[in-house]
Amino acid sequence: MKVLILSDGHGVPSRLDELADAAKSYDMVLYGGDFAALVDTATALPFLERLAAFHDRVFAVTGNCDERDFRETVDEYDMCVEGSLSYFSGLMLAGSGGGSKFTGLTPNERSDEELVGDLRLVEESAADSADSWNNLVVIAHNPPHGTKLDTIANGMHVGSPLIRSFIEARQPLLVVSGHIHESFAIDALGSSTLVNPGSLAEGRYAVAEITGGNGKPFAVSSIELKTLG
């Protein structure tokens, strides 16, 4: 299964146009949040509309730059996985939207308890056995703390400790984050593969291949960071 991984488009739909032909060869698209530009939430809807036309199987969460109620709009386009479970080709997909409280200048900053709360709702819905999480894909705009995905320019780790704890406890197959543009990276926590594809607005994205299913364990057989043009 080929997976196209995007995040932080920030109201620049022309970047999707640059990937439109390539997107046809992917089975699904994972989007890690921030539809809107940093200072213009009105740019979120045009980007969402373009993303909906971009591929017929998109799974997404909102970011800290998106209005809190924008998740309802994303849900109207049948791609929101915040606080819920979606299923595709044997995979479970769940997500956490928004970013940690930091500057207070963006509309969707949330407490760590709120961020992981989206995923704890999923815990209540899924079977509680070790092997039941091998097929889980998590999309969390805010990256897990203390990884290659959450380091800002001064070297400080600004990710979510509770999202990290969730990953360590449940060991999902794949975790997609965004938010920290400079930390476009691939990492791991236990058996979980982690990726921050970087900002699509800056021309960054990632691709992955998932194998398994039909009675065989799922695995991320390859994952790679990419840059447009």
Name what the model sees in each region.
Residues 49-53, 59, 146, 151-213:
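Conserved beta-sheet core of the metallophosphoesterase superfamily
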Residues 1-4, 85-95, 131-137, 188-193, ...:
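Beta-strand-turn-beta hairpins that frame and shape the catalytic cleft
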Residues 5-7, 29-34, 58-64, 80-82, ...:
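Active-site neighborhood of phospho(di)ester-bond hydrolases with catalytic His/Asp-centered motifs
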Residues 11, 66-162:
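Conserved catalytic scaffold of divalent metal-dependent phosphoesterases
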Residues 10-15, 36-41, 64-71, 101-105, ...:
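Active-site environment of divalent metal-dependent phosphoester hydrolases
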Residues 132, 151-152, 214-229:
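A short C-terminal boundary segment appended to hydrolase-like catalytic domains
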Residues 6, 11-88:
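Core catalytic region of metal-dependent phosphoesterases/phosphodiesterases
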